[in-house]
């Protein structure tokens, strides 16, 4: 299983010291006040997740990891699934969000709760509490909202928020709906403070303006100084944000991104990212991370850091069994141990997805082969050879494999049993060139 340790086991004196070392804090309220809150008696904290898609992604995973660190230290988590704010959407850096139907948002909210519940403890003294801001927002009239909440917000301060200011200066501008989002989020913090004495909110660094709205509101109407902190935004090698709206999301839901592909995402990260990713996305002790980083520098070909990272994050999100299945599938694919026949159909399809070809309609599909078709024809269809004669030469030299079994006969045909899960036949040329055909 993934290593999940509290700050003392990880080699740190305080929780804040660990979070800072791991690069999990970008901005915060007064550091001494935050440190005192985290190091004292258990507090209640919250993080909001808007159901603007059917799954969370790795940008949200950073927040869940922060929540887990605090939970392990004995603090009490609240996961707010934004049944109300999810109907509106927080302002993006550019472009208005699409407003989704209420029933769709409600369905997504249920899925997000299940994902969060698979990562945070849902039982015990400090089990995660789930709330929806729809419960206290939906019944509020416009008059109540403007009188009781809106009057506490100054327009100048709201207009100065980074995202709002940027959108105001853009061609598309910003709607009143998205402009009001920060007021709703501020009211959420106030409600949770009143209801559960919640004194800390977590979020991504792009949420800083929304987080401070609640901070200022509580100070103004309750006279109490609470805390917020943000984590950095995760970017890819080109500096672009990993997220739903960027089109390259790494989803946490196994039905939207298989555990195999999730595992492959992490194991294929470059050496230069190992230190930051091991710190941020694993709970490994400081000494072990330092050892792995040094190993990646002195013996990069071993890829121990990448393998450890992929195991830790995938098992944290999807569990040990799914992670081991992903590893076994990868090994079986290239004939390095494990049996192709043992891979379930869903994992198999995910593993082979990269071997689709573009058909005459521009669609990515598996090339079709039927029982009785020659292996050399299937290999050509899979894009491994340009001609039958080229395929025959490769077979003669012992370099063609069907489901990891070497082909000896140039005229061998596919049998019903050659289609794994009744659907796929895997053909390999040499050690690394792979292709797949589908019986359909």
UniProtKB/Swiss-Prot annotation:
It comes from the Bacteria. The keyword Nucleus does not apply. GO terms for molecular function: ATP binding; RNA binding; tyrosine-tRNA ligase activity. NCBIfam families: tyrS. Its EC number is 6.1.1.1. ATP binds at residue 244. It comes from Bifidobacterium longum (strain DJO10A). Its main location: cytoplasm. This is Tyrosine--tRNA ligase. Transmembrane segments: none annotated. A motif ('KMSKS' region) lies at residues 241-245. The gene is tyrS.
